[in-house]
């Protein structure tokens, strides 16, 4: 069984926002906090781009679902209105 703190952290990460994890460099070894070479910058930019594209896709999908639900609600309201007349 997981401790409460671990369970709470796992539940927080399961929300709709993707957590961003960056690689430390080409060799996988930890680097100093101040060293940023071109590979790390390029990799971070690529990962950021991928995350933004994924979030755009999710947002588009949610908007489509919302539009379908709005149409369904409008249809049901029209049906109710026609029955009450």
Curated annotation (Swiss-Prot):
Transit peptide: 1-22
Annotated compartments: Mitochondrion
Primary location recorded for the protein, binned into one broad class: mitochondrion
Name of protein: F(1)-ATPase inhibitor IF(1), mitochondrial
Result after altering residue 41 to Q/E: No loss of inhibitory activity
Stated family: Belongs to the ATPase inhibitor family.
Presence of the UniProt keyword Coiled coil in the record: yes
Keywords per UniProt: Coiled coil, Mitochondrion, Transit peptide
InterPro entries to which the protein is assigned, alphabetical: ATPase_inhibitor_mt
Cellular component, GO annotation: mitochondrion
Organism this protein belongs to: Saccharomyces cerevisiae (strain ATCC 204508 / S288c)
Residue ranges that the Swiss-Prot or TrEMBL entry lists as coiled coil: 41-84
Domain observations: The inhibitory N-terminal region (residues 23-59) is entrapped between the C-terminal domains of the alpha(ADP-bound)-beta(ADP-bound) (ATP1-ATP2) subunits in one of the 3 catalytic interfaces of F(1)F(0)-ATPase.
Subunit-level organization: Monomer and homodimer. The protein aggregates less strongly with increasing pH.
Role played: Endogenous ATPase inhibitor, which inhibits specifically the reverse ATPase reaction of mitochondrial F(1)F(0)-type ATP synthase. It limits ATP depletion when the mitochondrial membrane potential falls below a threshold and the F(1)F(0)-ATP synthase starts hydrolyzing ATP to pump protons out of the mitochondrial matrix. Required to avoid the consumption of cellular ATP when the F(1)F(0)-ATP synthase enzyme acts as an ATP hydrolase.
UniProt key word Mitochondrion: yes
GO molecular function: ATPase inhibitor activity; enzyme inhibitor activity; molecular function inhibitor activity
Miscellaneous information on this protein: Present with 981 molecules/cell in log phase SD medium.
């Amino acid at each position: 069984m997981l401790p409460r703190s671990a369970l709470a952290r796992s539940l927080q990460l399961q929300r709709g926002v993707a957590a961003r994890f960056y690689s430390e460099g080409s060799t996988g070894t930890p680097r100093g906090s101040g060293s940023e070479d071109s590979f790390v910058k390029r990799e971070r930019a690529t990962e950021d781009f991928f995350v933004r594209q994924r979030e755009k896709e999710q947002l588009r999908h949610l908007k489509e679902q919302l539009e379908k639900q709005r149409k369904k609600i409008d249809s049901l309201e029209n049906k109710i209105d026609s029955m009450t007349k």
